[in-house]
Swiss-Prot record:
GO terms for cellular component: cytoplasm. Its EC number is 6.3.1.5. HAMAP family: NadE_ammonia_dep. This is NH(3)-dependent NAD(+) synthetase.
Amino acid sequence: MNTQCLHLNYALVEDILLAFIRNEIRKFGFRSAVFGLSGGIDSAVVCELAKRALGPENVLAVLMPYRTSSPESVNDARLMVEKTGVRSEEVEITGVVDAFFDGVSGAGNLRMGNVMARARMLYLYDISARDGRLVIGTSNKTELLLGYGTLFGDMASAVNPIGDLYKTQLWGLARHLQIPEELVSKIPSADLWEGQSDEADLGFGYGEVDLLLYMMLEKRMSRSDIIEAGIEESFYDKVRKMVVRNQYKRMMPVIAKISARTPGIDFRYARDWQEVK
């Protein structure tokens, strides 16, 4: 089995995602959207999809660099704004993040990165309240499964059109959508600190982990069958541990049940109520 099994009919995927964005925006009672545009491929795909679904005048892309952000990332984000014609704002988060850590020693890259991600989401939700725009997410399926993201940071949104697409599938969709090649081919990075890259953080490439996740989830193959197919035991065990350990990041907060009807457990109705009286 190779990564060819991950290939999708990207024209059909586009149609599904455009309808998804339009329908979900309408169900929530909104007409426009806001999202963070980093200069990476995930947010670039969301930018193009949102533009096609809602029209550029109804989409706001927010660029939120930190002082260590790569100038290339900022330029790539601006390139997407120019290409799509969506509205944009630039918010410098350095002051907020540095003030948070003022007098704090030994924070390290992980804590700094988490605060950057949450600062960005804070700005997005404030803009949502200011303008009446719905926040669209930009986390892909690989990130969500591995827990490679910040809870209530970059993983926070009202709707997420790309959350069921593996990273390698995002590249395929990006080329179908004619995203500039310099964004598609660049090394994936959350750009949280200088020299950071996704695959260096994770310790493996997206192609190999996407294939393993596909075997585990879509094909529901057993550990023994996956290893027999050529996946190393240590790699399988590492990835499975990450998926299991980060389950809490893919859930709403768990509520302790006390009463007969509990929100999220047995008090559940269709989200898109047609009338609220």
